[in-house]
């Protein structure tokens, strides 16, 4: 087990009637036919060797670090009755949390005072809550790293390409927020946490991004590759959105079931039901169950010392199947007992040792109701066996860059030819590619308060 800590949403979970109204609003912002019962955010797929040529070489991609935090959408909306702005966080279980204390302004049109007078309304952002270490105070701080924008002030962006969505996020949301904090710091002193845009590099800069992972103020466990020109995939797996992890970081979320051994007491009569009893002094078997789909209900116990009874196991096995056993040392078992927390039925994130094949626990995932679906587990196992290394990715960089340049030059030649033939305006000069700089994942001067 490692020391990873999942951040908690600093908000109040909303009741059903409020949540339903908010889901209807999100449905409208996403241009969806009906409100989603599940998390509306897109989900990446595990990276495989074939993705290098079939995807990274075939089309333009952004690359960024894969933050090891809590994935949440952020909805900013103005109450039509009270006129007050509300900020809501949507977690992976599609729960809505009201986070008080923020003010998110619109981009000023004439004067800076508009930062205090205007409010974002109908803005939906995708990002990750993360715990960062402040280099000045050495204290842990909560921050929201934004990496996509699904709607801005009531205008849906899900059909726009990623490049356009990021431009809207930067100009229409992040800039006025950052200007507000810069010009009126006293007005922002009680904000629950800070926000930053996650830096996006071009895919051929993947080595530079990978080399920066251990220098970040938060935990990062890999890379995310996002296609530049595709729309946002609402509420499900996006086969073009790729997550790469080093072999040792590829993990699976299982449901943990403790199988407490039973011991026979020969001093008790054979027909006495007390002859066999659960031996709580012995270390149990730590069974890992994989989710088959469907609702998981009534299977979490309140006391880690109590095993599942027959009825609870029958309920569990309608949606879960025993998959493997977790390797826990005696020392680790003592650590778990010392927590004095319920263990049965919790979701645990585990990694597989490539040499021994045993599963080891990274941490509890209490932000998840269910473990990974069996199809996801299979993909992760394929990714582990396929084992794309950073060296494999590095070797592909020249081919990725060459293909990128060919597409850029081809687009320019087509663009230039079209204008030349129409004679509507003089021949355009090629747009210089932005010089790549060192990744700036958070604002360098944004640690002071």
From Swiss-Prot:
Classification lineage: Eukaryota, Fungi, Dikarya, Ascomycota, Saccharomycotina
Family annotation (InterPro entries): mRNA_cap_enzyme_adenylation, mRNA_cap_enzyme_alpha, mRNA_cap_enzyme_C, mRNA_Capping_Enz/RNA_Phosphat, NA-bd_OB-fold
The keyword Acetylation belongs to this UniProt entry's keyword annotation: no
GO cellular component, as recorded: mRNA capping enzyme complex
UniProt biased composition (Basic and acidic residues): 424-442
Region entry Disordered, spans: 405-449
Organism (species): Candida glabrata (strain ATCC 2001 / BCRC 20586 / JCM 3761 / NBRC 0622 / NRRL Y-65 / CBS 138) (Yeast)
Signal peptide extent: none
Role played: Second step of mRNA capping. Transfer of the GMP moiety of GTP to the 5'-end of RNA via an enzyme-GMP covalent reaction intermediate.
Family: Belongs to the eukaryotic GTase family.
Record field: compositional bias (Polar residues): 414-423
Active-site annotation: 66 (n6-gmp-lysine intermediate)
GO biological process, one term: positive regulation of transcription by RNA polymerase II
UniProt EC number: 2.7.7.50
Location(s), subcellular: Nucleus
Superkingdom of origin organism: Eukaryota
Protein name (record): mRNA-capping enzyme subunit alpha
EC category name: transferase
SUPFAM superfamilies reported for this sequence: DNA ligase/mRNA capping enzyme, catalytic domain (SSF56091), Nucleic acid-binding proteins (SSF50249)
Catalytic activity as recorded in UniProt: a 5'-end diphospho-ribonucleoside in mRNA + GTP + H(+) = a 5'-end (5'-triphosphoguanosine)-ribonucleoside in mRNA + diphosphate
CDD domains linked to this entry: Adenylation_mRNA_capping
Any GO MF annotation of the entry: mRNA guanylyltransferase activity
